[in-house]
Amino acid sequence: MAKTLTIDEMHELLEELETNYHLMHSDELPELDLYMDQVVTYLWDQIGGLTRRPGEDKILTKTMINNYTKAGLLNPPDKKKYNNDHLVSLIYIYMFKNFLSISDVKAVLDPVREACFTEEEREGKAPKKGEEEKKAPLEFTKVYDVIRDSLSRGKKELEKNISEEIDSAAETFEDADPSLRPMLQQFAAVCRISADIYMKKLFLERLIDASSDSYSTTDT
């Protein structure tokens, strides 16, 4: 039988999530480049707490990394080694792919990647002999740090919003049978939070479409 959580237990679940939520600053990333197995282990250790079932769910596999590279989401490794730009890319991909399709993830990352990496870097090609080495206008890890710091500042507000949704759910079904009230209030919390997630996801999808060169609102 499914377990119903009380309002207090839902707040405790949120507090547990708050404790596990941490995105490392670029200064915390490894000083040395890593092989693929090391990348998988490192990200498991660093962001494993952000999975649905910490300690059980996989962050990524070697097959996933290869597929992301083939899809143009990840720069090819240098002599089978991955640097901090690769790690940051994988963090973005992991977070986005939970609610966006891979094609949408690519659409989101492509403009940033083009500003942070030269074409040679994105394709894993060495500069031609005698040709001056090109440099991208932005540094990928610095962009990440700005985003990461912004998320950290907004974390409390996000937590507060979820907490308020739980409290609002606690005010519903006050006249219901006491034996059914916790289940109904949990359902109300799920519906309220789901509606919020749905609207944000829909906005993201429409934002991506509106920003895509291939998207058109013209009827065919």
Which residues are covered by each model-predicted region?
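Basic helix-turn-helix/winged-helix DNA-binding cores
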Residues: 2-115
